Design a protein with these regions (language model features):
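Extended intrinsically disordered terminal tails
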Residues: 1-198
Length: 198
């Protein structure tokens, strides 16, 4: 079910179990990138691992927020993904207005605040840090871009816009950008330099 209101079929070849998206995930079909070999077999690119309904009230940035910021509007349909996306966009917009992250202009237009995504990211980070702190009984040490992080890769947290790695030390932890290369080292010591934030 696609954003144009039609159902599309694509031959993706053989997918391993990890590459099959879960029901409710939002994906895009993508070919090879600029630095990759051209291929006739499209690949799935995960846009969000969170279903639309949960995104409407999520305390953090979502695929819906990106659609709102870029002023994307689905084609109007009565059923299917486009109808669900339209309904979710309206619900998310109302939620953002309630949080004063979208402002109403005098002519009735709804305009996202310039710092909307940053404010959502900060709210998400604070909530995730508090949750992990309670669970691990440890204090969160925020990562600073360009600094070195060492510790044990504990687990990953899936958010609507990606994953965050929990790097644990004795009585502290850091929420760091997640990379697929970390997965084989779960439960093991890791080290790295913090790059740009998500």
């Amino acid at each position: 079910d696609a954003v144009d209101g039609r159902v599309h079929y694509a031959d993706l070849g053989r997918l391993n179990a990890e590459a099959v998206p879960a029901r409710g995930n939002i994906v895009a079909l993508a070919g090879g990138g600029l630095n990759e070999k051209p291929t006739s077999v499209p690949r799935l690119h995960l846009l969000s691992a969170t279903d639309l309904e949960r995104q409407t009230t999520y305390e953090g940035p979502t695929w819906l927020d990106q659609a709102i910021v870029t002023r994307w509007q689905p084609e109007i349909r009565t059923t299917g993904f486009t109808a669900e996306a339209d309904k979710a966009l309206k619900a998310r917009t109302d939620w953002l207005v309630g949080r004063q992250l979208i402002e109403q202009t005098q002519d009735g237009k709804q305009v996202p605040r310039a710092d909307m995504m940053k404010a959502l990211r900060q709210a998400e980070t604070q909530q995730l840090a508090a949750d992990v702190s309670r669970r691990l009984n440890a204090a969160c040490v925020p990562p600073m871009p360009g600094t070195r992080i060492t510790g044990t890769y504990d687990h990953a947290i899936t958010t609507p816009t990606g994953k965050i790695a929990v790097i644990r030390r004795e009585d502290t932890f850091t929420l760091a950008p997640w990379r697929r290369a970390l997965e084989p080292f779960r439960g093991q010591a890791v080290a790295g330099i913090v790059g740009p934030t998500r």
